[in-house]
């Protein structure tokens, strides 16, 4: 996949003009009180519910087009909105309103010997671009999190959800206007032409950061072609390592949960590593448990399968010779998302957690727990698999930067 496609100058102008409007809106958003933002979020939730019939009508147009194109049922389900899901996205906005506001939080500060008073505090990023695939709920999630963190957002969703996203954004913008706020805090970019992505991710000086949400192809293309900072999210080749000191009952329960709970999400297990010391018993037992649950086990995996994010009822199985071999395997094939060890050996667990390079490392727990809500952060914009600027579940604090404030009393620096 490539997002680096030529486009007519008018599309470039359209995207850049939207970014300029977002920049203006972001300057006001950065100074809003917490109560004003919370009131706007609650108003947006009310408006989404009031406009549910319009949103569902738009969604039905998208679904009709998708069905005609032979879209698989799993993808249709991700695209679909119904009254219950509309209730869910509205509840999500109210939840964000209840979360602590990160803007203005003082992270550290002190008074220097010369009397200067320093403090470092959180400030919004500014203009955030979100590029995402066919889940219209992301439209509302992204709006809620960016508004609460004082950012303006440019949304570039999938053409498969064009009518759904347009209806949702119309409701969100109407709620902002009703609250006396700038509707350009949230804007939907054209999705009919892939080049709109190119113009968004190359709008250096207009857009502060772009966050791609979707499959590996989308994320790789955005990161490759972007000229503005990006935060990679989501690609998950997650492993469960069953150590020689593992309780196999526990290992089986954790493995089945990690693989089968929701196989199409980024925190699902895609590989299981079994210690050679227990392989004779553990391999047939865990293979049978997986197969009984409907999982296809790739027991002699190819290089491609070892690196695969299946997002399906498939899993690669490999035998490793001890904890260091497991660590080496994970660091070679993992995507830096979530890795898990099942063991009763504290030293082995500590070695694994210290040496595995991932955003989250689980000990005797399912990879499925890597989630902003499960971590107690509330909503999230995605799971960052990079190290700068954020790593792991991205909640409100991860949508901020910092500013140093220095107070003096006529201070000047000596020559």
UniProtKB/Swiss-Prot annotation:
<keyword id="KW-0641">Proline biosynthesis</keyword>
<dbReference type="InterPro" id="IPR012134">
    <property type="entry name" value="Glu-5-SA_DH"/>
</dbReference>
<dbReference type="InterPro" id="IPR016162">
    <property type="entry name" value="Ald_DH_N"/>
</dbReference>
<comment type="function">
    <text>Catalyzes the NADPH-dependent reduction of L-glutamate 5-phosphate into L-glutamate 5-semialdehyde and phosphate. The product spontaneously undergoes cyclization to form 1-pyrroline-5-carboxylate.</text>
</comment>
<dbReference type="InterPro" id="IPR016163">
    <property type="entry name" value="Ald_DH_C"/>
</dbReference>
<comment type="pathway">
    <text>Amino-acid biosynthesis; L-proline biosynthesis; L-glutamate 5-semialdehyde from L-glutamate: step 2/2.</text>
</comment>
<keyword id="KW-0028">Amino-acid biosynthesis</keyword>
<dbReference type="InterPro" id="IPR000965">
    <property type="entry name" value="GPR_dom"/>
</dbReference>
<dbReference type="Pfam" id="PF00171">
    <property type="entry name" value="Aldedh"/>
</dbReference>
<dbReference type="GO" id="GO:0050661">
    <property type="term" value="F:NADP binding"/>
</dbReference>
<dbReference type="InterPro" id="IPR016161">
    <property type="entry name" value="Ald_DH/histidinol_DH"/>
</dbReference>
<keyword id="KW-0521">NADP</keyword>
<keyword id="KW-0963">Cytoplasm</keyword>
<comment type="similarity">
    <text>Belongs to the gamma-glutamyl phosphate reductase family.</text>
</comment>
<keyword id="KW-0560">Oxidoreductase</keyword>
<dbReference type="GO" id="GO:0005737">
    <property type="term" value="C:cytoplasm"/>
</dbReference>
<dbReference type="InterPro" id="IPR015590">
    <property type="entry name" value="Aldehyde_DH_dom"/>
</dbReference>
<dbReference type="GO" id="GO:0055129">
    <property type="term" value="P:L-proline biosynthetic process"/>
</dbReference>
<protein>
    <recommendedName>
        <fullName>Gamma-glutamyl phosphate reductase</fullName>
        <ecNumber>1.2.1.41</ecNumber>
    </recommendedName>
</protein>
<dbReference type="GO" id="GO:0004350">
    <property type="term" value="F:glutamate-5-semialdehyde dehydrogenase activity"/>
</dbReference>
């Amino acid at each position: 996949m490539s997002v680096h496609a030529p486009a007519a100058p008018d599309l470039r102008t359209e995207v850049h003009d939207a970014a300029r409007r977002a920049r203006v809106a972001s300057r006001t958003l950065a100074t809003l009180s917490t109560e004003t933002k919370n009131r706007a979020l609650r108003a947006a939730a009310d408006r989404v519910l009031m406009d549910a019939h319009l949103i569902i009508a738009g969604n039905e147009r998208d679904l009709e087009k998708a069905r005609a194109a032979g879209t698989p049922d799993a993808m249709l389900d991700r695209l679909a909105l119904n009254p219950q899901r509309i209730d869910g996205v509205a509840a999500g906005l109210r939840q964000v309103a209840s979360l602590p506001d990160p803007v203005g939080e003082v992270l550290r500060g002190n008074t220097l010997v010369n009397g200067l008073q320093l403090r470092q505090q959180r400030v919004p990023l500014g203009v955030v671009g979100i590029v995402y695939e066919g889940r219209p709920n992301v439209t509302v999630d992204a709006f809620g999190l960016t508004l609460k963190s004082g950012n303006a957002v440019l949304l570039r969703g999938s053409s498969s959800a064009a009518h759904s996203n347009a209806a949702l954004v119309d409701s969100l913008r109407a709620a902002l206007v009703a609250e006396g706020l700038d509707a350009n805090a949230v804007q939907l970019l054209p999705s009919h032409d892939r080049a709109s992505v190119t113009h968004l991710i190359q709008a250096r000086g207009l857009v502060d950061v772009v966050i791609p949400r979707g499959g590996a192809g989308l994320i790789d293309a955005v990161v490759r072609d972007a000229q503005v900072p990006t935060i990679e999210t989501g690609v998950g080749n997650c492993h469960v390592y069953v150590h020689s000191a593992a309780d196999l009952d526990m290992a089986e329960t954790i493995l089945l949960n990690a693989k089968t709970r929701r196989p199409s999400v980024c925190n699902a297990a895609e590989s299981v590593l079994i210690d050679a010391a227990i392989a004779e018993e553990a391999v047939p037992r865990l293979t049978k448990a997986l197969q009984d649950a409907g999982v296809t086990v790739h027991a002699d995996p190819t290089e491609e399968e070892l690196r695969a994010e299946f997002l399906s009822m498939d899993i690669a199985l490999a035998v490793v010779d001890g904890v260091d071999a497991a660590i080496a395997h994970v660091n070679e094939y993992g995507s830096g998302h979530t890795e898990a060890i099942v063991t009763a050996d504290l030293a082995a667990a500590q070695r694994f957690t210290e040496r595995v390079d991932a955003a989250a490392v689980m000990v005797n727990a399912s990879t499925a727990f890597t989630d902003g809500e499960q971590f107690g952060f509330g909503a999230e914009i995605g799971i960052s698999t990079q190290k700068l600027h954020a790593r792991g579940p991205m909640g409100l604090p991860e949508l901020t930067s910092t500013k140093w404030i220095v107070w003096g009393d006529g201070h000047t620096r000596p020559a």
